[in-house]
């Protein structure tokens, strides 16, 4: 069940002095968090305070004192979320959001004491990400995809459209695996941020942090072919000059791609090679990281290429590579 419980009424914050808007603005401007992350914080806070209003019998928060919250209310909030089928990791994230807001209240002088300063956020083991094996990846990129990219989806109405979509999709998949992009980074990628001659891409990730990631030769070749077809496509369509397009990956009308389209095309193509439930762009990002570590890349370098701000985020992949090392050991060591 989705965690859309405790939707606040339009009058919930009427007369309230809680500086939620100021807190969210700080997250956006000073901490450079992405709009989606700020929205997640906002949703978490609104759900928490909506629950409190219901629990305390308040029509709005005009008379609410944030210091009156106790561990009892926090536990009841968690219990209510569990009852509604909210996942444990989502609950932990919501508590972390509330804890961060209360820390802001204390630092800005709105409250003197916060029970959240001594309240530990529940920690749950991170899921080991799914990935394609080296054999699956080789078969997909070197056999299935080159043979007939259009075989994965409904063909376009004419050869010109088909050629454009085919090469665009192929280069998207190649780049996702070659450089481990997030879907937002792929969609937002601009032509000037891609250097195919020197083989690298400049990415702007979470928190607007920039990084440079190598692009493999196979992806470079696919992108060069795509740009060639793209130029011809927009010239023949007479819908504008392809050189004027800002973004690398666009629709047939020249507009920037949207997330659902990339999710959909990735799922269709990857169905041919894996039966994993989540066949999304992140599967290729996980595959990128896992294959690098399997081939001996050091954790810090992989973390930099993924754009992780914390090395512990990258360490989840070491579980996968450790299992591979154990398999190699069992096969190679005489006393294994």
Curated annotation (Swiss-Prot):
The keyword Secreted does not apply. Belongs to the 'phage' integrase family. XerC subfamily. Residues 127-330 form the Tyr recombinase domain. Pfam families: Phage_int_SAM_1 (PF02899), Phage_integrase (PF00589). InterPro entries: CB (IPR044068), DNA_brk_join_enz (IPR011010), Integrase-like_cat_sf (IPR013762), Integrase_catalytic (IPR002104), Integrase_recombinase_N (IPR010998), Integrase_SAM-like_N (IPR004107), Tyrosine_recombinase_XerC/XerD (IPR023009), Tyrosine_recombinase_XerCD (IPR050090). It comes from the Bacteria. Site-specific tyrosine recombinase, which acts by catalyzing the cutting and rejoining of the recombining DNA molecules. The XerC-XerD complex is essential to convert dimers of the bacterial chromosome into monomers to permit their segregation at cell division. It also contributes to the segregational stability of plasmids. One of its GO terms (molecular function) is tyrosine-based site-specific recombinase activity. The lineage of its organism: Bacteria, Pseudomonadati, Chlorobiota, Chlorobiia, Chlorobiales. CDD domains: INT_XerDC_C (cd00798). One of its GO terms (cellular component) is cytoplasm. It is found in: Cytoplasm. This is Tyrosine recombinase XerC. It comes from Pelodictyon phaeoclathratiforme (strain DSM 5477 / BU-1). Residues 14-106 form the Core-binding (CB) domain. Forms a cyclic heterotetrameric complex composed of two molecules of XerC and two molecules of XerD.
């Amino acid at each position: 069940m989705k965690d859309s419980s405790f939707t606040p009424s339009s009058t919930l914050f009427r007369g309230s002095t809680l500086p939620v808007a100021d807190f969210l603005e700080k997250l956006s401007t000073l901490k450079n968090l992405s709009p989606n992350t700020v929205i997640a914080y906002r949703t978490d806070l609104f759900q928490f305070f909506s629950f409190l209003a219901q629990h305390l019998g308040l029509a709005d928060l005009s008379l609410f004192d944030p210091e009156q919250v106790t561990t009892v209310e926090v536990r009841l909030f968690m219990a209510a979320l569990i009852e509604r089928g909210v996942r444990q990791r989502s609950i932990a994230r919501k508590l972390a959001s509330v804890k961060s807001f209360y820390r802001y209240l204390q630092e800005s002088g709105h409250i003197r004491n916060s029970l959240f300063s001594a309240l530990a956020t529940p920690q749950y083991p991170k899921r080991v990400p799914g990935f394609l094996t080296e054999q699956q990846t080789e078969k997909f990129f070197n056999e299935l995809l080159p043979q007939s990219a259009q075989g994965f989806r409904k063909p376009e109405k004419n050869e010109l459209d088909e050629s454009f979509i085919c090469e665009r999709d192929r280069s998207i998949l190649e780049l996702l695996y070659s450089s481990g992009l997030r879907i937002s980074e792929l969609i937002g990628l601009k032509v000037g941020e891609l250097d195919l001659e020197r083989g690298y891409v400049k990415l702007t990730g979470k928190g607007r942090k920039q990084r440079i990631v190598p692009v493999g030769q196979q992806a470079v070749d696919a992108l060069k072919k795509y740009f060639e077809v793209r130029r011809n496509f927009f010239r023949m369509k007479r819908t504008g000059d392809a050189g004027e397009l800002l973004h690398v990956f666009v629709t047939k009308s020249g507009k920037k791609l949207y997330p659902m389209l990339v999710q959909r095309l990735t799922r269709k193509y990857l169905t041919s090679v894996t039966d994993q439930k989540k066949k999304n762009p992140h599967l290729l990002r996980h595959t990128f990281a896992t294959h690098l570590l399997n081939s001996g890349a050091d954790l810090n370098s992989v973390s930099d290429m993924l754009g992780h701000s914390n090395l512990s985020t990258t360490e989840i992949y070491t579980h996968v590579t450790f299992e591979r090392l154990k398999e190699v050991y069992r096969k190679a060591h005489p006393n294994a």
